[in-house]
Amino acid sequence: MENQKMPISSVSNLKDLNMISRPVANFPPSIWGDRFINYACEDENDQAQKEKQVEELKELVRRELAITVDKPLQQLNIIDATQRLGIAYLFENEIEESLEHIYLHTYVENTCFEGSDDLYSVALWFRLLRQNDYRVSCDVFNKFRDNEGNFKNNLMEDTKGLLELYEATHLSVHGEEMLDDALEFTKTRLESVVSHLNYPLAEQVRHALYQPLHKGLPRLEAVYFFRIYEAHASHNKALLKLAKLDFNLLQSFHKKELSDIARWWKSLDFAAKFPFARDRLVEGYFWVLGVYFEPQYSLARKIIIKVFTMISTIDDIYDAYGTLDELELFTKAMQRWDVGSLDQLPEYMKPCYKSILDVYNEIEVEMDNQGSLFRMHYAKEVMKKLVEGYMDEAKWCHEKYVPTFQEYMSVALVTSGYTFLTTISYLGMGEIASKEAFDWLFSHPPVIEASESVGRLMDDTRSHKFEQERGHVASGIECYMKQYGVTEEEARDEFRKRLVKAWKDINEECLRPYRVPKPLLMRILNLTRVIDVIYKNEDGYTHVKKAMKDNIASLLIDPMIV
């Protein structure tokens, strides 16, 4: 990180200095400009026609889900296609009833079904029930292992079955060594055969090895699956058409939403006021779409994206610009949460602090209208705690202090921002986000710690080199290396093991019976998925390269051809 001299006019209370040395990170600018500010509304007649088609097709699909009730395998395949095409949210009740029926008859009553001796069918059955939070045992795969516990050799040629088993293994919980073995077995075999397969199976295998379904963003996975599903001659034409129409309607809805937010963001002029900070509104909105894309969560998205942009700027003030004295002032102002604190801040900090108060006041009015004013207490407290964590890291950086790994993680889990983002994600979710739900969240349950761990460990793993080059606070990799006297690669291996553990914790916490309503758990799962996607190979939020550009284009630029 470069130390650059900045004019004293940008700060206050330091009149005895002419220039201040600042640790500027030189983040790349936004690549989008004003692209998403203007939104051309679709012709109302065309829109109405598409909506009518969607309603008609929904009835067709609804009937098909009901018709297959006594054919579990056929029903599982329709449910799988519905979910992978991104339209399961349209049929939540029907899918829940179908899976409940299948669970009771094939698992509780142990009734055999067509395909119950076939690896693909059993793995699909297991994955869909686990994916929908049913506690089914992995012992169902014992029939595919020999007396020594190894998977049978005759499975080696069943690529379709191996692929389905591979996807199922990512839903494992602690104590399921069989699924750990299955993951290693299927991954090794699929990697060895992928270059010899034909389309579309080759593409399915290649994609799954890169992005397992369970850890992917449902809407992004749907974009990929459209062409795979269409390539199968036996695909359900009504289902595919419905999925494409719904995708395009939702994309228009999201583009309008982003256009409104982009105009608000431009009116703040943060790009000019905070040129040292990351200008990542579009990337932030993509992040939020990963948390919830459904139309009923429009208010929730508008709330979280505004807060998201604020906290991204605050992060960079602490991380890449502010002096320790200035950051102390800002931290104290955040604890007071009072517009009167503006006068005590350096000039450049004032627009950010004022905007935070304004955004929270706007949210408070909405919460008051809903009779949910109690939520603001949690929203403010989690912000204060996050800023305190940023301050701790700033002190470490200033003192060139390398904490123990345990000390580092006690702060770094907070500054991962995932308890913060989960709290904010609940604000616009309606009555389901009760006081009891917020109290549960603030008790720091295992699923939250696991989500924070994924966020922190993946961030540290992907951004370690860049952060160290710019003189950032010691990363988890660096802390672990120093404390345990290991190499960087050994530290990375340990992080990979911890990521596996964290995902198992998340999978376990999402199984029935739920501690809080499922939609609230889904926010945590989806936030964790976002990290897996954006930080797959690098910090795609800070350094927006081809993968991130393509993902954003898929959801917010390119429509489906119906």
From Swiss-Prot:
Binding-site residues for Mg(2+) 1, renumbered to this chain: 315, 319
Co-factor binding details: Binds 3 Mg(2+) or Mn(2+) ions per subunit.
Cofactor(s) annotated in UniProt: Mg(2+); Mn(2+)
Coiled coil location: none
GO biological process: one example: diterpenoid biosynthetic process
Key word Metal-binding present: yes
UniProt-annotated binding residues for Mg(2+) 3: 467
Keyword tags: Lyase, Magnesium, Manganese, Metal-binding
Motif (DDXXD motif): 315-319
Enzyme Commission number: 4.2.3.-
Binding site residues for Mg(2+) 2: 315, 319
Gene Ontology molecular-function annotations: magnesium ion binding; terpene synthase activity
A family per Pfam: Terpene_synth
Job description of the protein: Sesquiterpene synthase.
Recorded family membership: Belongs to the terpene synthase family. Tpsa subfamily.
Name assigned to this protein: Probable sesquiterpene synthase
Organism annotation: Santalum austrocaledonicum (Sandalwood)
Gene: SesquiTPS
